């Protein structure tokens, strides 16, 4: 009987490992890459190819400048309905709106009274929700002019509104994650919170980026803004307050080369584009400490023009961030 039991246990383990959605066992024992992880990575790679975005090298330098969010030049391989970059970003928002109705209408446009005609006396900047504009525009306007204005306003909204979480939500939608598996939101912190709380049935587990090996399909996240969450401990301490006001960003891991000690990630709204980033790993296969702003304070030196003639100017590093959370795909 004991031998039979041991065989059954072994068989169960093999079946779990062979499952297309094989779960990561823990932060310390990530396990193999799942089919869902590979699917998410491929979706991100396909999206990058269509958008033709930026690329950042392992030193944090922008070495390829691609299309940006409000680009009006046709995408090389764009789908007929999304032939421009800005229309593609609008697609991300539309997809998010199907999971969180009202998201689109609440996006805001920034403007200032009199700014075009008399900038010297222009009023302070104001915000208007997209819903208000659409409701109040003239109903009897010429169809052509109405379309021109509507498209211009949508492009302005896209420029004014961070869309990186909408990009991640779009990928999750394409991969078929349910509302129980992923908290669709326009803010990364909202979908990070259930992972930190250990919500049952959630697709991701929250781990310390400094202690966990990333896998394809995982998300790596950092805090940003004036008072960012700088470490995993900060995220844990603030878990009950994580909402749309908490500024953060997440990339999805799309490739890993442990021999070369590097990984590739993809993120939306990174320098206003869908951006491919290369990051370095340490000898344990974890994110290199060279990328951790909590250990290496960000430089705040002269601007780029001054750097041309100032040898003391510190180079910008787009990879130096307050990386704290690794969202491990279960």
Which residues make up each language-model segment?
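...with weaker cross-activation on analogous glycine-rich loops/strands in unrelated enzymes
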Residues: 184-271
């Amino acid at each position: 009987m004991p031998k039979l039991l041991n065989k059954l246990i072994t068989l169960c383990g093999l079946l779990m490992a062979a499952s297309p959605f094989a779960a990561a066992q823990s932060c310390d024992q990530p396990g193999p890459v799942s089919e869902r992880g590979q699917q998410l990575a491929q979706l991100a790679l396909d999206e990058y190819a269509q958008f033709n975005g930026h690329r950042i090298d392992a030193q944090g330098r922008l070495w390829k400048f691609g299309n940006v969010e409000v680009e009006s030049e046709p995408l090389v391989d764009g789908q007929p309905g999304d032939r421009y970059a800005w229309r593609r970003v609008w697609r991300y928002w539309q997809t998010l709106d199907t999971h969180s109705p009202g998201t689109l209408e609440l996006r805001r446009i920034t403007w200032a009274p009199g700014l075009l005609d008399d900038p010297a006396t222009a009023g302070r900047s104001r915000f208007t929700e997209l819903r208000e504009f659409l409701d109040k525009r003239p109903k009897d306007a010429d169809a052509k002019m109405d379309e021109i204005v509507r498209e211009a306003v949508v492009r302005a909204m896209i420029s004014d509104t961070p869309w990186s979480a909408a990009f991640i939500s779009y990928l999750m939608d394409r991969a078929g994650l349910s509302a129980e598996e992923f908290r669709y939101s326009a803010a990364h912190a909202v979908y990070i919170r259930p992972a930190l709380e250990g919500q049952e049935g959630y697709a991701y587990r929250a781990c310390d980026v400094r202690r966990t090996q990333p896998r394809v399909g995982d998300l790596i996240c950092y805090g940003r803004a004036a008072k960012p969450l700088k470490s995993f401990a900060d995220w844990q301490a603030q878990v009950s307050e994580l909402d749309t006001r908490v500024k953060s960003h997440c990339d999805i891991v799309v490739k890993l080369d442990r021999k070369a000690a590097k990984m590739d990630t993809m993120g939306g709204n990174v320098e206003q584009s869908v951006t491919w980033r290369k990051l370095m790993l340490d000898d344990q296969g974890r994110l290199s400490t060279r990328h951790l702003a909590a250990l290496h304070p960000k430089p705040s030196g002269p601007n780029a023009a001054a750097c041309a003639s100032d040898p003391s100017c510190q180079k910008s590093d787009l990879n130096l961030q307050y990386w704290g959370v690794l969202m491990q795909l279960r």
